[in-house]
Amino acid sequence: RDRSPSRGLGDVYKRQILKNKRIAIFSNHTGMIGDKHLLDILLENKFNVVAIFSPEHGFRGDADAGEHVSSSVDKKTGVPILSLYDGKSGKPSEASMRKFDILVVDIQDVGLRFYTYYASMCRLMDACAEYNRKVLILDRPNPNGHYVDGPILDMKYKSGVGWLPIPVVHGMTLGELGLMVNGERWLPASRTCDLTVIPCKNYTHQTLYKLPIPPSPNLPNMKSIYLYPSTCYFEATPVSLGRGTDLPFQVYGHPNMTGYSYSFTPRSVPGAKNPPQLGKLCHGVNLSNMSDEEIWKRGIDLSYVIDAYRNLNMDDHFFRSFFELLIGTDYVRKMIKEGKSAEEIKARWKDDVEKFKVQRKPYLLYEE
């Protein structure tokens, strides 16, 4: 077993690239270097940090999914927190962009197309390209970096939960993805930004990396992070995936599902104030006892969604249009309605996976 992966930062504050620059950071509560936050380390070393951009869930990481997080100041340091969304088309405003020279990105991602941190990074890269600002990504391991799975996004479904033509599980770090965005000219108007990536050390795509800090309120443990690519689709259905319980993304159920011995009741909790099926007894399945190895072996497993779909017998009332935004293509819902199995559906996107693996290869910083 090799040494555990570490950040290749060396002493980030000794980097020439940050000298005498006005610095903005894109980070949140996961931006820890050892037991200190990047923001505090930069300030302690007398760097001129002028702004913080914070993603969904806010800078301290405690807001609900999609909740409006207003611009403010960080109470601890007094550094202004700027909105990612105060300008046109979900980008920061020109006034925000003129405040700094270089953007430092340090945030823990989980490597899935519908997990929004990478889309925020892409919007910032686009704004930095437009206003000629440098970007420095302090790379972090991807806990789902050991495989690629799912259909490539059909760009007619581009949205906040799907920003790039990549599979659901892209298997890349944010640094690799940033390089690919530049190299494939994926930013609007084919812009590219001035990008530097500081890679991790002792890391390959087969390194199993356990996150020291939960990346958002409803991904509290590794089991939730491994099951997320299979259970997230319940967000587009009436079925609860365990928000408001101790096992978010690790269970699924509904008051009208029958024939199950397991049940749970969603409650209002921090990070899930008003979860689906709030206060109702839901019958269904607990996946949290499945071994990590079993989850990895299955990759994206649509059998959970298919099981609930068949059990509830709601036909067209089961899926909302959000389903296509999450899965990224129109054939999956059709095949589920036609009675196809999870395996048959997965076979349909196998070519996408192989194609993407070839396409991403030039941008990989770590051995596959």
Predicted regions and their residues:
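Single conserved hydrophobic/aromatic residue that forms the stacking wall/gate
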Residues: 1-13
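Glycine-rich, charge-decorated loop segments at or immediately adjacent to ligand/cofactor-binding or catalytic sites
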Residues: 61-66, 136-158
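Glycine-rich, aromatic-lined ligand/substrate-binding cores of catalytic
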Residues: 201-278
